[in-house]
């Protein structure tokens, strides 16, 4: 008819899968060849059901090895209910190995907001069978509840997320077996992470990332503590080189956009954490200062950061400077 209108919509698939990693070989102290590197892979909607599959592997060839895998299946049976499972293995040289498993039921309030109710447990093995007061075999289990909110930044490939909030609490128990103690203790777990980008104008912005973890227990052992430090934590320190039962991180960047594909930024990271030594809580402060850049290429985002980490009242030393490199490819 004269008044009829036809609308044609052509949908083009958007790349949402990401890959980041490298593999290298080096000689250790015994002149043997060791494998080092990392792999960070995230696949989304490959089965056209909205699922997310993540794989992470990292080794420094000597002290630490980490493996993580998770899968999330949303909208089961066409309902807002989903399922998420994950496994994480962390090995510290010949000292201990932790294996953590978790399963969560999720409720999708909307595309950006999710609620979780789940269970997680960790089994830790004292590889050298020392069973001391510092490192020991243990098992823990927690009932957890979580909240996840993400606000995307549309039409921005370099900074696709404007705001993100994740909060999780867990209540559970830990069983340990040492030479001096065989007991079961109640524990409380708290994890809060929040990020936000404040846009001053088209070229200037401030990025803030707050990461907070707390484990409440009557007694702590080394192989259950949180580990932090590195590119996605307080920069200027080696990956997972720090440990604590309480840690609060504030990571900040002032960003200046030179062109649509290139930006420079400052680095100012602050860390407050607590450890327990001989039943006495010790509080420490760390600072990471540096500069960085990001380059949006055809295939992904290349990031380079140079940061120097030092403790409070510690003199600045140039040899503490660490270079962090990341290339996140989308396909």
What function would you assign to each model-found segment?
Residues 1-81, 150-159, 244-248, 256-258, ...:
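Outer-membrane beta-barrel initiation region
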Residues 16-18, 81-220, 273-276:
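Transmembrane beta-strand segments of outer-membrane beta-barrel domains in Gram-negative
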Residues 36-40, 54-56, 68-70, 164-331:
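C-terminal transmembrane beta-barrel domains of outer membrane proteins
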